[in-house]
């Protein structure tokens, strides 16, 4: 199979939405029957985002094969059917590590290792490898043109443009066309300078996607075309919209997919965007609204919980309601008490690390349990629910996780030291293991118990969800907790580890050790999120009753 490559760069400012634009174009091409994948090349030195602060970088998105990747891969999976893997995201740090490892082995036969050709060749190999088996591979280059960090990536894609030729490569550049209120017009000069910068390193863009808060007038499009040496039909206006799921239709309306397929000589059907039209209709026509309190420690940056936010919205579409997310810093609960939780239709405690704010999360779980308020715990959210139950129902005073208190008399949650991964390999960890890349990661089978809310949500007795954690329920306490009324509704592949818990006499109190938000999409949703939002709707109606 001959793979075509679309390279996506950004200029003027960061955060223009390269990932959304790339994913939206991929969605249109997929709707035309093409097999599409998307890659993200990140210019930072970290090997992966796994140990980066969520408040700096946003969430870490986990792929099926256990790669800890950039949150843009979450956008990719929400827009197209193709599942991402570790080949879809790599960093400068990963490239340098591999090149240096080869140098130590002697693979370069004593050569002087340089950015060109050794680093650029390694980048090109990764790009070509990631595109194998697909009709089209869209490659997003992180950062902004002009950044020193991005230069090796830009040089690599420049070389690929020459080596593969124009019939297999296309360069798409996102840029900002700001509107100046004082002048009463949009300004194209930043775009002209950005393209000049890009051309100075040998890349001539074929398509310009011009971002702004309004559509660009046709006369300004003509001006951009003239000064940037790009066909006028290839100057695409991408204005701000109230829903990112409207962007595929916006791009299609301007003929971007036709331009791409003709450039590549691809014969394919017209794009059918009816699924996206349905998503947009559901989003615009809710029959009600529920308020979900998200209790976490990274609440100052919503992107830290990007996939959870999106999964709640998707569940809202399924239940025909809009979901209002109220971010609650768990430390505020510790300081002010549970009155900050009043007026909610449900509580969600997402994953997290570290002791800060953990008691506030435990208080949130207790509030939900005692007030019959729908509760959904994810990863740490399951562990705090179990700790709360152990303390206040099972009579295990001062029960805790050894992550937060190594001297707790009742370590109901502890460091997992050994487990069997999805390939049947035995994985082992200990207290001194590195933080990066040492967690239980990736998609794993979960056995569900018949008659539970978990089995009801998944409409079966198994599910496959993705993990990212080091700590697990301590099996020593399972029998005592079960006797107190806790149901272990999901177990690992070998049935040795607790994957899900729930309360049978509660309207909806369900928690999982895995991260179901990573598999939610706007077209299909995710069973547990759909069940949680449905329970919030029912709680609200009963409350109003």
UniProtKB/Swiss-Prot annotation:
Q: GO cellular component annotations, sorted alphabetically?
A: cytosol
Q: Which GO terms describe its molecular function?
A: ATP binding; CTP synthase activity; glutaminase activity; identical protein binding; metal ion binding
Report keywords, A-Z. Answer: ATP-binding, Glutamine amidotransferase, Ligase, Magnesium, Metal-binding, Nucleotide-binding, Pyrimidine biosynthesis
Which GO annotations describe the biological process of this protein? 'de novo' CTP biosynthetic process; pyrimidine nucleobase biosynthetic process
Looking at the record's lineage, which domain of life comes first? Bacteria
**Region (Amidoligase domain), start-end ranges:** 1-266
Q: Which PROSITE patterns match?
A: GATASE_TYPE_1
SUPFAM superfamilies (UniProt xref): Class I glutamine amidotransferase-like, P-loop containing nucleoside triphosphate hydrolases
Top-level enzyme category: ligase
Annotated CTP binding sites? 14, 147-149, 187-192, 223
Regarding activators and inhibitors, the annotation says: Allosterically activated by GTP, when glutamine is the substrate; GTP has no effect on the reaction when ammonia is the substrate. The allosteric effector GTP functions by stabilizing the protein conformation that binds the tetrahedral intermediate(s) formed during glutamine hydrolysis. Inhibited by the product CTP, via allosteric rather than competitive inhibition.
Q: Where is UTP bound in this sequence?
A: 14, 187-192, 223
State the oligomer form and interacting partners. Answer: Homotetramer.
The protein's matches in PANTHER family, at most eight in alphabetical order, are given as: CTP SYNTHASE, CTP SYNTHASE-RELATED
Q: Which family does it belong to?
A: Belongs to the CTP synthase family.
Function per UniProt = Catalyzes the ATP-dependent amination of UTP to CTP with either L-glutamine or ammonia as the source of nitrogen. Regulates intracellular CTP levels through interactions with the four ribonucleotide triphosphates.
Q: What is the protein named? A: CTP synthase
Natural source organism: Shewanella loihica (strain ATCC BAA-1088 / PV-4)
């Amino acid at each position: 199979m001959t793979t075509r490559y679309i390279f996506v760069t950004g200029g003027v400012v960061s955060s223009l939405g390269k990932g959304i634009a790339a994913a939206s174009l991929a969605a249109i091409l997929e709707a035309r029957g093409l097999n599409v994948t998307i890659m993200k090349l990140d210019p930072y030195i970290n090997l992966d985002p796994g140990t980066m602060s969520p408040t700096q970088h946003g969430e870490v998105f986990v792929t099926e094969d256990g790669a800890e990747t950039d949150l843009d891969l979450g956008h990719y999976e929400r827009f197209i059917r193709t599942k991402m893997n570790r080949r879809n995201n790599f960093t400068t740090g990963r490239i340098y590590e591999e090149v240096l490892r080869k140098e130590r082995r002697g693979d370069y036969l004593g050569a002087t290792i340089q950015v060109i050709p050794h680093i650029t060749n390694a980048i090109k190999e990764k790009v070509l490898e990631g595109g194998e088996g697909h009709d089209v591979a869209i490659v997003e280059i992180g950062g902004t043109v002009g950044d020193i960090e991005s230069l090796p990536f830009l040089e690599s894609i420049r070389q690929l443009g020459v080596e593969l030729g124009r019939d297999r490569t296309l360069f798409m550049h996102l840029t900002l066309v700001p509107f100046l209120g004082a002048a009463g017009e949009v300004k194209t000069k930043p775009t002209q300078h950005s393209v000049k910068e890009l051309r100075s390193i040998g890349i001539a863009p074929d398509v310009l996607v011009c971002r702004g808060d309004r559509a660009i007038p046709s006369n300004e499009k003509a001006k951009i075309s003239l000064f940037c040496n790009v066909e006028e039909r290839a100057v695409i206006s991408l204005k701000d919209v109230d829903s990112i799921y409207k962007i595929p239709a916006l791009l299609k309306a301007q003929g971007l997919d036709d331009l791409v397929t003709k450039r590549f000589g691809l014969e394919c059907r017209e794009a059918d965007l009816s699924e996206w039209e349905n998503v947009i209709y559901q989003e615009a026509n809710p029959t009600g609204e529920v308020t979900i309190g998200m209790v976490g420690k990274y609440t100052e940056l919503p992107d830290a919980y990007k996939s959870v936010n999106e999964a709640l919205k998707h569940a809202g579409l399924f239940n025909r309601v809009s979901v209002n997310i109220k971010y609650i810093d768990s430390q505020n609960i510790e300081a002010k008490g549970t009155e900050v939780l009043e007026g909610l239709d449900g509580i969600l405690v997402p994953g997290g690390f570290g002791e800060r704010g953990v008691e506030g999360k435990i208080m949130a779980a207790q509030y939900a349990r005692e007030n019959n308020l729908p509760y959904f715990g994810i990863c740490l959210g399951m562990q705090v629910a179990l700790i709360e139950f152990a303390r206040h129902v099972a009579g295990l005073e001062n029960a805790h996780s050894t992550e937060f208190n190594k001297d707790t008399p009742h370590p109901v949650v502890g460091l997992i030291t050994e487990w069997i991964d999805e390939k049947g390999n035995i994985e082992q960890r200990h207290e001194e293991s590195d933080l990066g890349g040492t967690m239980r990661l990736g998609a794993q089978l979960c056995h569900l118990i018949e008659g539970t809310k978990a089995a009801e949500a998944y409409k079966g007795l198994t599910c496959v969800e993705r993990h990212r954690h080091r700590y697990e329920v301590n099996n020593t306490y399972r029998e005592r907790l079960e006797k107190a009324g806790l149901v272990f509704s999901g177990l690992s592949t070998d049935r040795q580890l607790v994957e899900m818990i729930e309360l049978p006499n509660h309207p909806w109190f369900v928690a999982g050790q895995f991260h179901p938000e990573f598999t939610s999409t706007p077209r299909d949703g995710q069973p547990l999120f759909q069940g949680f939002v449905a329970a919030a709707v029912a709680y609200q109606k009963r409350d109003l009753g």
